[in-house]
Amino acid sequence: LECYQKSKVVTCQPEQKFCYSDTMTFFPNHPVYLSGCTFCRTDESGERCCTTDRCNK
């Protein structure tokens, strides 16, 4: 899978949409994202997944 950098988020697809759970805020206007979305697809070599913080092959 290819990785695309969007600010500090790495995705598998350039237009991938994200959902975050920003339940913690230590500083004003700087939320800490505790979770994101994962994109997976299955091909001949098995399932490949991409998370919001890294790409796995």
Swiss-Prot record:
Disulfide bonds: 3-19, 12-37, 40-49, 50-55
Membrane-spanning parts: none
Keyword annotations: Disulfide bond, Secreted, Toxin
Further remark: Is classified as a P-type cytotoxin, since a proline residue stands at position 28 (Pro-31 in standard classification).
Record-linked InterPro entries: Snake_3FTx, Snake_toxin-like_sf, Toxin_cobra-type
Protein's name according to its UniProt entry: Weak toxin CM-1b
Keyword Iron attached: no
A molecular function GO annotation: toxin activity
GO cellular component, one term: extracellular region
Listed SUPFAM superfamilies: Snake toxin-like
Family according to the record: Belongs to the three-finger toxin family. Short-chain subfamily. Orphan group XX sub-subfamily.
Tissues and organs where the protein is expressed, per its UniProt entry: Expressed by the venom gland.
Protein location: Secreted
Gene3D superfamilies in the record: CD59
